[in-house]
Curated annotation (Swiss-Prot):
Catalysis performed (reactions): [protein]-peptidylproline (omega=180) = [protein]-peptidylproline (omega=0)
InterPro entries: PPIase_dom_sf, PPIase_PpiC, PPIase_PpiC_CS, PrsA_foldase
Superkingdom to which the source organism belongs: Bacteria
Protein name in UniProt: Putative peptidyl-prolyl cis-trans isomerase jhp_0161
Organism of derivation: Helicobacter pylori (strain J99 / ATCC 700824) (Campylobacter pylori J99)
Length: 299
């Protein structure tokens, strides 16, 4: 799963990287995929129509993921990255051959990209300055004490749910479950979930509305509140409303809560307070810029 996510995330970075890549030495050369000693020693991983693909072409990835290190990748992962780089270069060459890079649409797109990149670069510089600021220990400790129960208690629940559009539908389903003896309630819940739920994942999987394990902050607040209030083997006797519709929840199991100590939570708290400070500084700076700018809004 993680590898697939990584590979998908790299595509955008590779594309941006090749926009600034070196031009081909000979556009008429056929595509080569060689591992000559001279190229390898120079850090050339492959060539496409004479244009080298090197480790520096993956620098954009490192900017997005500081832990990225090409040399530490497995051989298959390196090959997959190089193959993606080759595919990107081939498409880029074809687009240039069709002179798409000279069209007004492309130039307008590039201007928009450059503007956004400049804004993001400026924001990155502001964030770097904020990171240099030391968050007082007392402020972090106070934040922990005020938010311990909401943010720093780990507890997982394993539940099923049935999602329907209306409250009346939910009440009808609850009534059907109520009629069953205790030993058969979960089986009835599974049957009704497979038949009546409008949750597309549960409907397609026909898994009895099984949500797997989740923590409080992973679900809608009202859903989590209702689910964690149940005891294993019990279900909600009134419909639970969220933005998705009306839920009936059946609790399979619930772990005992584990509270993170201040020292365990400290890195997270520091990051959260730095993010808050960053947003405050950004808003403050933008307001300062607004005061000195001439802004006209046409209506």
């Amino acid at each position: 799963m993680k590898k697939n996510i990584l590979n998908l995330a790299l595509v955008g970075a590779l594309s941006a990287s090749f926009l600034m890549a070196k031009p081909a030495h000979n556009a008429n050369n056929s595509t080569h995929n060689t591992k000559e000693t001279t190229d390898a020693s120079a850090g050339v991983l492959a060539t496409v129509d004479g244009r080298p693909i090197t480790k520096s072409d993956f620098d954009m990835i490192k900017q997005r993921n500081p832990n990225f290190d090409f040399d530490k990748l497995k051989e298959k992962e390196k090959e997959a990255l190089i193959e993606q780089a080759i595919r990107t270069a081939l498409v880029e060459n074809e687009a240039k051959a069709e002179k798409l890079n000279q069209t007004p649409e492309f130039k307008a797109m590039m201007e928009a990209v450059k503007k956004q990149a400049l804004v993001e670069f400026w924001a990155k510089k502001q964030a770097e300055e904020v990171k240099k600021i030391q968050i007082p220990e007392k402020e972090m400790q106070d934040f922990y004490n005020a938010n311990k129960d909401q943010l720093f208690v780990k507890q997982e629940a394993h539940a099923r749910h049935i999602l329907v559009k209306t409250e009346d539908e939910a009440k009808r389903i609850i009534s059907e479950i109520d009629k069953q003896p205790k030993a058969k309630k979960e089986a009835k819940f599974i049957e009704l979930a497979n038949r009546d739920t409008i949750d597309p994942n549960s409907k397609n999987a026909q898994n009895g509305g099984d949500l797997g394990k989740f923590q409080k902050n992973q679900m809608a607040p009202d859903f989590s509140k209702a689910a964690f209030a149940l005891t294993p083997g019990d279900y909600t006797k009134t419909p639970v409303k969220t933005e998705f519709g009306y839920h009936i929840i059946y609790l399979i199991s619930k772990d005992s809560p584990v509270t993170y100590t201040y020292e365990q939570a400290k890195p997270t708290i520091k990051g959260m307070l730095q993010e808050k400070l960053f947003q405050e500084r950004m808003n403050q700076r933008i307001e300062e810029l607004r005061k000195h700018a001439k802004i006209v809004i046409n209506k």
